[in-house]
Curated annotation (Swiss-Prot):
Source taxonomy: Eukaryota, Viridiplantae, Streptophyta, Embryophyta, Tracheophyta
Similarity comment: Belongs to the dihydroorotate dehydrogenase family. Type 2 subfamily.
Keywords: Flavoprotein, FMN, Membrane, Mitochondrion, Mitochondrion inner membrane, Oxidoreductase, Pyrimidine biosynthesis, Transit peptide, Transmembrane, Transmembrane helix
Pathway noted in the entry: Pyrimidine metabolism; UMP biosynthesis via de novo pathway; orotate from (S)-dihydroorotate (quinone route): step 1/1
Co-factor binding comment: Binds 1 FMN per subunit.
Protein name: Dihydroorotate dehydrogenase (quinone), mitochondrial
Listed GO CC annotations: mitochondrial inner membrane; mitochondrion; plastid
Cofactor names: FMN
Amino acid sequence: MAGRAATSSAKWAREFLFRRVSSNPLGATRNCSSVPGASSAPKVPHFSKRGRILTGATIGLAIAGGAYVSTADEATFCGWLFNATKVVNPFFALLDAEFAHKLAVSAAARGWVPREKRPDPAILGLEVWGRKFSNPIGLAAGFDKNAEATEGLLGMGFGFVEVGSVTPVPQEGNPKPRIFRLSQEGAIINRCGFNSEGIVVVAKRLGAQHGKRMLAETSATSSSPSDDVKPGGKSGPGILGVNLGKNKTSEDAAADYVQGVHNLSQYADYLVINVSSPNTAGLRMLQGRKQLKDLVKKVQAARDEMQWGDEGPPPLLVKIAPDLSRGELEDIAAVALALHLDGLIISNTTVSRPDAVSNNPVATETGGLSGKPLFALSTNMLRDMYTLTRGKIPLIGCGGVSSGEDAYKKIRAGATLVQLYTGFAYGGPALIPQIKEELVKCLERDGFKSIHEAIGADHR
């Protein structure tokens, strides 16, 4: 195994050191009036002095890894590589927030990130919607908006990855700057406004990736025993969700979501109707009882009228805001139960400013707040929704997760699956195995033998 790991490391180092990368000058804009050609990976922005420092540090780690791997087995080297990213990650804090985000997506798209080779502990595995998740920890929408890096992100050890939000027509989103760090509080404020390359570009990318994943699945199936429920998604290893949004200027929201279903659902293991971003005017009004019911009916009909194989159509979820009243939650729960919605994601970012950020001047920026200060609000709402839906609908807990204990609290409150984004932005790749390891300890500490046993434990 050491020999294979050494070969893999050497190949990775060569690619990193010698691959020529096309550059995209910082601040360059795309033309919204035309659909850009799909590419397998995003352009890397021009490196500033800080960017060159970051690159140099990463190259140094690659060289050190090459020297270390010759004496380590694959699993040991894998752990070392994830831990080594802790050295690189602080350099991202020196960069502009959106530039750092683009750089991270570019790295993941090119495979310049650690790849998890160690199998997940059996205690973390669970079945949802007829799919086997190797672990319940997923990456929320917003990181890989345009499906540029799904393979690299899934390879890092997430149980599932959600891309988007994807709008029908390309749009730039709101003016920059639009992402703001509150580092002391472990939070971010964003007002991106559904910046998206559009469904045509994303569909091309997902189609190309779909073919690769199918090949990987075929290879894995031929070498493993058959099972009634296969691990991974419909088109290969890893579960892929697609989050759908509406265009800012669209007058028919339902038509936008239906267009997303028609173009992207064949590549998705689940679909998400995003009606909760605070950065698109009027979007959150779609969470009202009548509006949501009408919208979900139209989207379900569009999905169900398509031709599906034995696996059937992808599950349909709705992502809701954390700033809802008890009455609004009751209305959403009633719609979800009446229409047999497949799941809810709780929650999106908040427009409120909890006491934890009140002394930070950045908190006055307009936009949705995510990260640690959102944890209590989103978890309390998750707990309420589990009660209102009587535990009959799978819930994805999202908001403020930055540790295994946080993920465990979400699960006990009623989450079947858990997502993170801001925690990943601050913690980097090393946070993924750390959360899974801590989650296992939490489960074993309280005597649970599986994730399923712990779901909703606070209600029993």
